[in-house]
Amino acid sequence: MLKRLQMMVALGAATLPLPLSAASVPVTLTPGTAFTRIGSRDIAMLGFNGTCPGPEIRQRQNDILRARVENGLEDGTLVHWHGIRLPNAMDGVNVLTQDVIIPNEGYEYRFPVSGSRCRNLLVSLPLPFLRTGRPRTVRPLIVEEPAPPDVDQDITAILFDIRLDDTGQFDMEFDRADFITAGRLGNLMTTFLSSEQARLGDHIRLRLINPTPDRIFEIRIDGLTGFCVAYDGMPLPELVSLGNLKLAPAQRIDIIADVTGDVILRETVPSGGEELGGIMLNGQRQIRSAPIAPLPANLVPAPGEITQTADLFMQGGAGGGAHGGFGGWAFNDVSGLPNKPLISARRDEAVQVRMVNDTAFPHGIHLHGHHFWETDQNGARTHLRDTTLVAPGETMTIVCVLDNPGAWMLHCHMLSHQADGMATWMQVS
């Protein structure tokens, strides 16, 4: 059954619903059951407004986003606006920023995207998916530049990973091994695309988003000649050539490229080339002669003197040593949010966090409300990101200017790991 479904998915990726504009009118988000078509089968999922993934929201920088959430679920819920710089009260994190929206109640999120340093974002609904047996839902939020690059198409690609049972429906069984190993990985992968056709010679922008709970994707894209231009919504000062692209859960990559054939996305691990979906040729145009240029930089304060440092030890999991936490995973011998923040800083302080992965599994570590610099082995700052992937046995040091007041979560974005202990927070006053 699963092999047959995988073959049907390989014939074509699913299409995202048409985008919504939220520049002048509020958007209503209604979480509930939605049926996602994969291959020839409708699969019951959680969705926004009857679709999963929900239709993307598009805004320009300087817009005010207004989103009303009407909770018709049997559980409390929140909406977290992943990767965006926003007021702390709008971050959608239980305990730290707001109480859950109880069933049959509503809540309006309202914040400017003028200060956003991100160009492609993700809205996720952190439902109690481990209890309901259904995954959280996602909806892309695209924040466009005041003067976007001149492209023929701007295409969103949402990577998707799901575990199906023998009947081809969502597998509602959970195993302890899902929490203490690499996470709850699916047995079927695909891609939801906002467009599935392009002309030979088209100049396109492709926004790759990995919203999956636990899977790390390693992608090869056939049929494109171009460059990576942004990581996690932050423009790269120098273009990065297209090779195999690794995206941990919550990471994003922007690409600008020319179409040179059918555009096929392939997962290279472990199958070595499983087709996830594609953009098929329909017509032809002359390839542009102008070279691809980097995107305009976002305004980010450069760190001055480092005023605070902290160590974040990742502990636990299968094959890991003992730790002081109650869960399968821990940060610094604590499972779950500790009473005291990892760092308590004044606004605009530059801090450094040394992340030590003392486990047998990789972890994608995400900071809310900010971006940070990854550093190399010599301590030099490299890429601005909001999520960094730390391999087993690796130490990654990040530098961040904490210039957004509030209580901000720092956690593993392999959500099975977060649910079983990998979470802490920072306080900015």
Which residues make up each language-model segment?
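N-terminal export signals
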Residues: 6-23
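Extracytoplasmic beta-sandwich strand-turn segments characteristic of Greek-key/jelly-roll folds
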Residues: 52, 56-59, 81-116, 191-196, ...
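Asparagine-centered strand-capping/turn motif at beta-strand->loop junctions
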Residues: 69-73, 208-211, 355-359
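Extended terminal and domain-junction accessory segments
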Residues: 24-30, 131-165, 237-362, 401-407, ...
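Structural beta-strand segments of beta-rich domains
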Residues: 63-65, 202-206, 349-351
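Short, hydrophobic/aromatic beta-strand segments
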Residues: 75-82, 215-222, 363-367
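N-terminal edge beta-strand
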Residues: 39-61, 184-196, 321-347
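Acidic-aromatic/histidine active-site loop/patch
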Residues: 153-202, 209-213, 324-334
